[in-house]
Amino acid sequence: MNDLRNIPQVDKIIKNEAFSGLDTSLVTMLARQILDEVRAKILNENASFESEEIINLILDEYYKFNEASLQRVLNLTGVTIHTNLARSVIDKEILKRATPVITGYSNLEYNLKTGSRGNRYDYVGSLIARAFGFEDAIVVNNNASAVFLVLNTFAKGREVVVSRGELVEIGGSFRVPEVMANAGCILKEVGTTNKTRLNDYEEAISDETAMLVKVHRSNFDIVGFSEETTANELSELASRQNLIDYFDLGSGFYGNLPFNLDKNEPDLKNLKDVSLVSFSGDKLLGAVQCGIIVGKKELIAKLRKNQLLRMLRVDKVIISLLAESIKAYLNKEFELITTQKLLHKSVKELENLANFINKSLKTPLEIVRTQTFVGGGAMPNKKIPSVALAFGGDANLNELKFRQKKVIGRIENDKFMLDLRSLLDDDVETLIKIINETEEK
């Protein structure tokens, strides 16, 4: 068919039995789109199309349209908090506990005792504060929002003192200096890239100073000839000068981390004297995406009054899942925090898992010891021991074959590898099945 007169009309083509049972309005929309493309190709390229071919083009677009854009993948990169693969995983038990609230009406902003309007942050705020030892807390949609809200609330139009070595950029071109400017603050840099002492901050304080800010360099490190001021030292200086001190912790963790990961890493339990601290919920904490701000009660109260909070607030889904995750910490149910569970797996456990998988494969794979990273922009210079299954043959071809099966691995030393550090327990049998199916072809 290369004659425009032979192109079927939309109302006729959608009556084809191939579209029986499908959404008529969507089929109609896609039919118009495909027929326009067919006309253009006939005119511009002298292309030829058969009716059956046009029907198949419409069907292909229909099923693509209905396929979920977000799809389940198996993370075999070894990176536990993989930003591109949605960071921390929520345990099914956490989801189960939160489900009654998520799937029904709730007292999100209703006080059951008084029968009047309530505040969505009261419960989760007190829960976080109790868990981590702070006076109060508030939650926004991510840590970038937390940084912006804190700066805008307490330092708009005034000076913010920060170390030159902490003016970082994280993923998505999020740059601290630009965020400060957009929040209405005046940036005052102190120290040098590799050294910033307490007296550098002290000498920079003026009548226009509102805050002393520390930013954790979570996604890079300065080694060698370097020196920095701790958050607690900055807090003491701020207290003497009647200023607010704020620590953008970034990843943030509480408790213990394996493989010496917590060495020189600021722990929430050691920051209780800092006026305000913010961190991500879906990184080392292992909960949902959000930004958590903890600190002095009177300062959190001022944050709640900022009109920006309505634009940055979280919904009942985030609050419910976060609350259940925090309760797991309080109850020492660390096995329900998937990120912590994966990071704490020993090399021996991973080797046992590799052997178990190999016994179920038609063709056993090479088991290799390797190293990986935490991910999520945290601890970039700290490697974690791990165990992987390595494939022979063309590494790029193997990577493509498994990616098409929604199994994401990595290439190392010219071999395609499936790193078991990030493999979820529920995905083991699925992985075995996919390996066997893929290796048969």
Swiss-Prot record:
Species of origin: Campylobacter concisus (strain 13826)
Function summary: Converts seryl-tRNA(Sec) to selenocysteinyl-tRNA(Sec) required for selenoprotein biosynthesis.
Lineage top rank: taxon: Bacteria
Gene Ontology cellular-component annotations: cytoplasm
GO biological process: conversion of seryl-tRNAsec to selenocys-tRNAsec; selenocysteine incorporation
Name of the molecule in the record: L-seryl-tRNA(Sec) selenium transferase
Keywords on record: Cytoplasm, Protein biosynthesis, Pyridoxal phosphate, Selenium, Transferase
Subcellular location field: Cytoplasm
Entry similarity comment: Belongs to the SelA family.
Entry keyword annotation includes Cytoplasm: yes
Cofactor: pyridoxal 5'-phosphate
Gene Ontology MF term list: L-seryl-tRNA(Sec) selenium transferase activity
Pathway the protein contributes to: Aminoacyl-tRNA biosynthesis; selenocysteinyl-tRNA(Sec) biosynthesis; selenocysteinyl-tRNA(Sec) from L-seryl-tRNA(Sec) (bacterial route): step 1/1
